[in-house]
């Protein structure tokens, strides 16, 4: 199973101060997630709706954390995760996959990806992110 070191940035920054990029093709989810995370003190540096726009946003905003929807319509969230990993960023952003589907539906794919893990969209919160990242 591929592993990814949590970025040095995450060791220095409180979870509520993380700079987050949201990658999802649902405008409604992006708006709701932004409000939820910003109300907890996180900074949302942008949103993206596709693999190409996600890579552009990662390179231009340098987020500490990227939340990636597994189903992006024409693109796969797993492809986004691997494309981010291929950028060889230092430090690399932490990547968390999100979905409305159950974690069990994607467990093997999540475990074999370079993402830190999975969160259900219904359980998304700053506390859940903090728990998943172990910070």
Residue ranges and their predicted role:
Residues 1-19, 29, 124-135:
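Non-catalytic signal-transmission and effector/linker regions of two-component phosphorelay proteins
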Residues 41-49, 57:
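Short hydrophobic/Thr-rich beta-strand motif most characteristic of the beta2 strand and flanking loop
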């Amino acid at each position: 199973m591929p592993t990814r070191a949590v970025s040095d940035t995450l060791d220095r920054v409180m979870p509520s101060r993380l700079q987050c990029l949201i990658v999802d093709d649902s405008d409604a989810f992006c708006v709701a997630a932004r409000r939820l995370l910003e109300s907890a003190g996180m900074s949302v540096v942008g949103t993206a709706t596709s693999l190409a726009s996600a890579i552009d946003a990662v390179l231009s905003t340098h987020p500490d954390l990227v939340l990636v929807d597994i189903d992006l319509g024409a693109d796969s969230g797993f492809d986004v995760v691997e494309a981010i990993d291929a950028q060889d960023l230092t430090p690399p952003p932490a990547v968390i996959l999100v979905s409305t589907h159950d974690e069990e539906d994607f467990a093997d794919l999540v475990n074999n990806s370079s993402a830190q893990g999975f969160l259900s969209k219904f359980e998304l919160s700053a506390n859940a992110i903090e728990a998943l990242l172990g910070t």
